[in-house]
Amino acid sequence: MRSGFALAILLFCALETAPVVAEPKTELSLIAEHPVEGMRGGNLSGLALCGDELWAVSDRDDDQIYLLDTRTATWQAQALNIDVPPVPESGLPWGLRSRTKAASFVRGGDLDFEGITCDAVGNRYIVSEAHAAVLQVPMAGAPQWLKIAPGMVREARASGLLLHFNALFEGVAINPEGNQIWLTAERERRGLVSIKRPQSLWDCDGPCVLLSEAGIEMQPGQMPKAKAISRNFSDVALFKGKLFTLESSQYQLCRRDAVTAAVERCWSFAADMLAPQRQYDQPYGLAEALVIDDGGAWIGLDNNFGPRADGEKRPMVYRFAAPAGGWGAQP
């Protein structure tokens, strides 16, 4: 009996870790690429479309966010200084927080801003990976941290999320009304978390964790020295009631149900982003920022100051056309 139970556990673990070879996906078409000048810390880690303005954050800059001037092919980042108040306690354990603090002295950026989003009136919301917290930067008034119930982090960790250094919250999306937020946990395990604000406190409405999954998957064939690596989420966007997850390890984005997080359809951007002249001598996908609109997708790269094959070192934003039939198209 014991040997049978042990065999079952081994089989389950094998299923969890066996590399998956993805089915072919429709390729998105690249229509423009824009280097970004003026980001002090480089490392573009989040994008948001607020009305007709594109905003960006860097995971190296704690005291400013960026409005992007997109009138020319080379975009100019215009800094908006922000006075960030002390970060509230989120429930992350001391070990994770201390490692993050130590890393900030080396790389800069104690807050580690990894995503930005906007509600319908233009308030901006920025997720701090280091602290599992969300900062609101209103159109008028001082920035403030959202009051999030500690049960959110407890539930996420109980589901296997937020357990590893530098693998915490990596993306954020908010509904137009400004009362529901979705957060992506990056990897090992990756997941989607949702919280709502009935009054002043953001809390779970039912389960916080919509998705928690492990597993590894082969990188696309265009990747030099492609290998099996952990599935990940590097950003999330909300468009017409659907979630779109940026999955940089596999160079894809996927449409998901906003309630269940179930996958509905995925598209690849590997063919154009991994064209020889656009490749980086880095072993992982660098896409970290996503905006979806009717016309297509904006995808931003955090290149860690590393050059592309053609020598370009600045942060990049790529524009991909929407797929045939639009983002709501069925397979």
Task: Give the location of each predicted region.
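Sequence/structural signature of beta-propeller domains
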Residues: 20-331
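N-terminal signal peptide c-region/cleavage motif recognized by signal peptidases
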Residues: 13-19
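Bacterial N-terminal signal peptides that target proteins for export
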Residues: 1-6
